[in-house]
């Protein structure tokens, strides 16, 4: 009976049904209430994060005293100049949101007149 007990103990941890203790630390689970994207490039605000933009780049900060997590998301632009300048807001005393869109630059140069 000692041999069966000994062979049962020699089975590596990855062959067991239970995950090893360190595997959960390697892949942290996503927080369920950060930010969810809806159609049209508009972001809905959920608990812990604030952010909304139509086209361009959005910087989103959550209220946290540890490390501020920043999400940079590029959304296809729906038109020229939908968002101009920057938008900032404070919610809960610690959250800030800003967004900006670069103006559209024409790809073709000036057309020369036939007289030139």
From Swiss-Prot:
Q: Which residues are glycosylated?
A: 2
Cellular component terms per the entry's GO annotation: membrane
Q: Name the residues that span the membrane.
A: 40-60, 78-98
| Region (Disordered) location | 1-36
Query: What does the similarity note say?
Result: Belongs to the TMEM263 family.
Q: Which Pfam families match?
A: UPF0444 (PF15475)
Q: What is this protein called?
A: Transmembrane protein 263
> Where is the protein situated, by its record's location annotation?
Membrane
Disease implication from the record:
Defect in TMEM263 may be a one of the causes of autosomal recessive dwarfism in Cornell K-strain white leghorns. A nonsense mutation truncates the protein and probably cause a dysfunctional protein. Autosomal dwarf chicken display small body stature by short shank length, with 30-40% reduced adult body weight despite normal hormonal concentration of GH and IGF1.
- The gene it comes from is TMEM263
Task: Tell me the keywords, alphabetical order.
Answer: Dwarfism, Glycoprotein, Membrane, Transmembrane, Transmembrane helix
| InterPro entries in alphabetical order | UPF0444 (IPR028153)
Role played: May be involved in the growth pathway.
What cystine linkages occur within this chain? none
Record's keyword annotation contains Electron transport: no
User: Which residue intervals are annotated with compositional bias (Basic and acidic residues) in the record?
Assistant: 1-28
Species this protein is from:
Gallus gallus (Chicken)
Topology class, membrane: Multi-pass membrane protein
